[in-house]
Amino acid sequence: MASTLDLDKGCTVEELLRGCIEAFDDSGKVRDPQLVRMFLMMHPWYIPSSQLASKLLHFYQQSRKDNSNSLQVKTCHLVRYWVSAFPAEFDLNPELAEQIKELKALLDQEGNRRHSSLIDIESVPTYKWKRQVTQRNPVEQKKRKMSLLFDHLEPMELAEHLTYLEYRSFCKILFQDYHSFVTHGCTVDNPVLERFISLFNSVSQWVQLMILSKPTATQRALVITHFVHVAEKLLQLQNFNTLMAVVGGLSHSSISRLKETHSHVSPDTIKLWEGLTELVTATGNYSNYRRRLAACVGFRFPILGVHLKDLVALQLALPDWLDPGRTRLNGAKMRQLFSILEELAMVTSLRPPVQANPDLLSLLTVSLDQYQTEDELYQLSLQREPRSKSSPTSPTSCTPPPRPPVLEEWTSVAKPKLDQALVAEHIEKMVESVFRNFDVDGDGHISQEEFQIIRGNFPYLSAFGDLDQNQDGCISREEMISYFLRSSSVLGGRMGFVHNLQESNSLRPVACRHCKALILGIYKQGLKCRACGVNCHKQCKDRLSVECRRRAQSVSLEGSAPSPSPTHTHHRAFSFSLPRPGRRSSRPPEIREEEVQTVEDGVFDIHL
């Protein structure tokens, strides 16, 4: 039966199920494993798993009436294959697991021990960790002591730990998450996929933040060089997803406009940067990336955004069913969907060739939560290098890779709300790591000198006095934990940027930064931050997501007044751009900073 199925012409679910049963022989050997795996993986696209289990039970009962012992045993072999190949589906779906238990109980009641022994539902391990947005898995401690300072980390060390973080997050994504995203076109009620996209965007933003935290062009150029080599190591690890995140951060408008900084980057680094950028550019539907991925052997981490885009394109181009009655499924579409999802599923079957340091993982996790808005990053970029019509005198003729074509926006989601208890536990472990590695004299406190070292990893950490609550000249574990709990994005702040709100009067209507509605009246109906000037309703105070930034003027060399950043009119939390491919000898086009970008270039776009 399996050999007679013509998927291109379409078939019913029953025909496909019968074909999968017939794909087994009486001993359990599969003659067409690809068909069986494809149907068992893809069936939730068309019918619920509980309905498939009911159909299997019906097939078994019908074969018993027909005295077809061969069909009975083949049905049991298919159930066994289903449980062993997709165990998470049974652990996370109690209704489905109960149906299989009922089938096994029926076999036992009939005294058919041989068939019953083929179905083992009790030994399915737990997969509840896959549904937890925040989860610390045990990791192996490296033998040698590793520095937690960003400036001291080797590119391979940083690449390995970024790979581990993203791989751990990726392993929690299930088929149902992909199906939900493609069906809804967004990540509504999809916290696991939201979290992965959030982590991807955090890496890109962290790259920008680390570059912009340096006060001089030479220092910023060194950080750029460091991240280019991190991207090179990510390619060696065949981690294309994080590679794209790092390259996206390096190519973002807040970084690409830093002409003086780029003039200090060496020609060899620029050449390497261009090559890495060309690898992940969207040109030719990511043809360079696809060729490189196809040639990979062993562990590989594909760019999730590219493959999600492929899934969405298929969903829009081809129908799931070939008839109005929804009885004949589109086998050609199912085969194409399966090829994409199987590539993604293969990632979890191969562990990355890295060993992770728990202290560094904790530090990186918290560092990546230092969220900034588009406006804030661009304003900081303007402070580092104010606008100027004339180009700086360059020690070299090197230029950064040119800006890219606009990439389509295709996802916009809210940052998942993490479990507060889990975040508190994670912060405590991170603080313990900080004290273990930065408390040089071992007195159980962080001095001002030690605090300055820590700020290398947290560029926009609040002042020493803000953490030193009792003003005794040093920071205790409890004070640091208290600070991070207050400023954690989960608890309302943003890593030290908590608003100093007070009641305010306004003679004219002003807009609430949270709900965008006007604050009307001259009485104290609103709140205003004394530091950054943000306004909000009293009832919006606890939901205000924008971080506090002290107001700073950005004045061009010509003395013109500051102007809004290019992203001001398009409120999006993060999207990144990729440089446009071109000849290396050509100069990049001038970026007109005064123009407003109506759509920021990006693959992932997520409101954090």
From Swiss-Prot:
Domain Ras-GEF: residue ranges: 154-387
Membrane association type: Peripheral membrane protein
Expression (tissue specificity): Expressed in striatal neurons (at protein level). Expressed in the hematopoietic system. Detected in olfactory structures and deep cortical layers of brain.
Record: residues binding Ca(2+) 1: D439, D441, D443, H445, E450
Pfam families with a match to the protein in the record: C1_1, EF-hand_7, RasGEF, RasGEF_N
Subcellular location: Cytoplasm, Cytosol; Cell membrane; Synapse, Synaptosome; Cell projection, Ruffle membrane
Residue ranges occupied by any N-terminal Ras-GEF domain in the UniProt entry: 4-126
Region (Disordered), start-end ranges: 382-405, 555-596
Positions of Phorbol-ester/DAG-type zinc fingers: 498-548
GO biological-process terms attached to the record: cellular response to calcium ion; Ras protein signal transduction
Keywords: Calcium, Cell membrane, Cell projection, Cytoplasm, Guanine-nucleotide releasing factor, Membrane, Metal-binding, Phosphoprotein, Repeat, Synapse, Synaptosome, Zinc, Zinc-finger
EF-hand domain span: 426-461, 463-490
GO molecular function: calcium ion binding; guanyl-nucleotide exchange factor activity; zinc ion binding
Residues that hold Ca(2+) 2 according to the record: D468, N470, D472, C474, E479
Alphabetical list of InterPro entries matching this protein: C1-like_sf (IPR046349), EF-hand-dom_pair (IPR011992), EF_Hand_1_Ca_BS (IPR018247), EF_hand_dom (IPR002048), PE/DAG-bd (IPR002219), Ras-like_GEF (IPR008937), Ras-like_Gua-exchang_fac_N (IPR000651), Ras_GEF_dom_sf (IPR023578)
Cellular component terms per the entry's GO annotation: cytosol; neuron projection; plasma membrane; ruffle membrane; synapse
Chain positions with Phosphoserine modification: S116, S117, S147, S554, S575
Function: Functions as a calcium- and DAG-regulated nucleotide exchange factor specifically activating Rap through the exchange of bound GDP for GTP. May also activate other GTPases such as RRAS, RRAS2, NRAS, KRAS but not HRAS. Functions in aggregation of platelets and adhesion of T-lymphocytes and neutrophils probably through inside-out integrin activation. May function in the muscarinic acetylcholine receptor M1/CHRM1 signaling pathway.
Record family assignment: Belongs to the RASGRP family.
Note on domains (UniProt): The N-terminal Ras-GEF domain mediates association with F-actin.
Subunit-structure text: Forms a signaling complex with RAP1 and BRAF. Interacts with F-actin. Interacts with RAP1.
Protein name: RAS guanyl-releasing protein 2
Species for this entry: Rattus norvegicus (Rat)
Gene name as annotated: Rasgrp2
